[in-house]
Structure formats: structure tokens, C-alpha cells
């Protein structure tokens, strides 16, 4: 199902991020005022894919022309998550999160964190449903107009590792 991303996926990662953001976050980043920063996002994906501590999993569409979903994680955090809007409601975000949490568990982690835009109501409902809890920490997002991000944490149920 999911596979590990390669440098060949960089543009498709950016394109999926754009599609998901434009559908879910237009109220935060109105495109007429804050156009999607395609070049900056592409540069960030280059850094993410080059980071030896991070793993990015992707799910191809059935024609392997575009990505349906991605999740990036490290030993202790879920860094990036997106599902193409055409596939919302199919449980792919849950599968991606659970896959990342399992990998963190195997690496010896007992808890995980993530940051989410406070105004990303759809994502926050999912995190709440999956047992993530807000820590009370906040920070400005790196992208203009720098909306507030909130931190979540979740215990990882120990396995046999």
C-alpha cells in the first residue's frame, strides 16, 4: 500500500500538498492574498527527503501518476500528513498515522507529537478521534500569514518490538 518516497516524488509531494491545502485551508491562506508558495514547499520537500532521521511514506494513485496520500515521521513526531481531497473520508489518513505510529513504536518510542494549524478543523477532529491530545503549546506557522499551530501528543501502545 504505502511505500517510501524517493527524490522522484518531490514534485508530486508538493502537488498533493497544494491540493490538500487549497481544499482544507483556503479560509486560512486565501489564494488571492497568499498564493501557494510552490517553490518554497518544493525546497522544503528536498530537505525533508534528504533528512536521514525522517521517513516519508506515499500512496500512489492506481495509475501511479500522482499521489493519493503521504505521511512523514521521525522517531518521535508525525511531521507531515496529507490526503488528496478526492480521497477524503476513505480512512487513508488514519492508516497513514497508524503506520507511522507503529514505526515509531518499533524504534522504541512510547509517545508521539505533531503540530497542526489551529484552524485546520478537519485534521483536528481526526486527531481528537484517534486519541491525540493537545499539550497547550502553540507557535506561529512558518508560512505567511503565520497562523497559530497547536501541539498534540499521543501515547504509543507498547508492542513486542
Task: Mark where each language-model region is.
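Conserved GNAT acetyl-CoA-binding A-motif
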Residues: 104-115
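Conserved beta-hairpin
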Residues: 53-69
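A short helix-loop-beta-strand connector motif used in the catalytic cores of GNAT acetyltransferases and
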Residues: 42-58, 77
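Conserved beta-strand-loop-alpha-helix junction that forms the acyl-donor binding cleft
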Residues: 88, 114-124, 140-147
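Conserved acetyl-CoA pyrophosphate-binding loop and the N-cap/start of the following alpha-helix
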Residues: 87, 91-99
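Conserved GNAT-fold acetyl-CoA-binding loop/helix
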Residues: 18-45
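A short beta-loop-alpha structural element at the N-terminal edge
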Residues: 1-15
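Conserved beta-strand in the GNAT
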Residues: 65-77, 82
Amino acid at each position: 500500500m504505502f511505500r517510501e518516497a524517493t527524490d522522484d516524488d518531490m514534485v508530486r509531494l508538493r502537488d498533493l500538498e497544494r491540493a490538500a491545502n487549497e481544499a482544507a485551508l483556503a479560509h486560512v491562506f486565501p489564494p488571492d492574498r497568499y498564493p501557494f508558495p510552490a517553490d518554497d514547499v518544493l525546497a522544503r520537500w528536498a530537505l525533508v527527503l534528504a533528512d536521514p532521521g525522517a521517513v516519508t511514506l506515499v500512496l500512489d494513485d492506481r495509475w501511479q501518476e500522482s499521489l493519493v496520500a503521504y505521511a512523514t515521521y521521525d522517531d518521535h513526531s508525525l511531521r507531515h500528513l496529507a490526503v488528496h481531497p478526492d480521497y477524503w473520508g476513505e480512512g487513508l489518513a488514519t492508516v497513514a498515522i497508524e503506520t507511522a505510529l507503529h514505526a515509531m513504536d518499533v524504534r522504541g518510542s512510547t509517545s508521539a507529537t505533531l503540530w497542526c494549524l489551529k484552524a485546520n478543523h478537519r485534521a483536528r477532529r481526526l486527531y481528537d478521534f484517534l486519541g491525540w491530545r493537545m499539550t497547550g503549546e502553540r507557535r506561529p506557522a512558518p508560512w505567511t500569514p503565520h497562523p497559530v499551530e497547536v501541539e498534540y501528543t499521543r501515547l504509543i501502545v507498547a508492542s513486542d518490538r
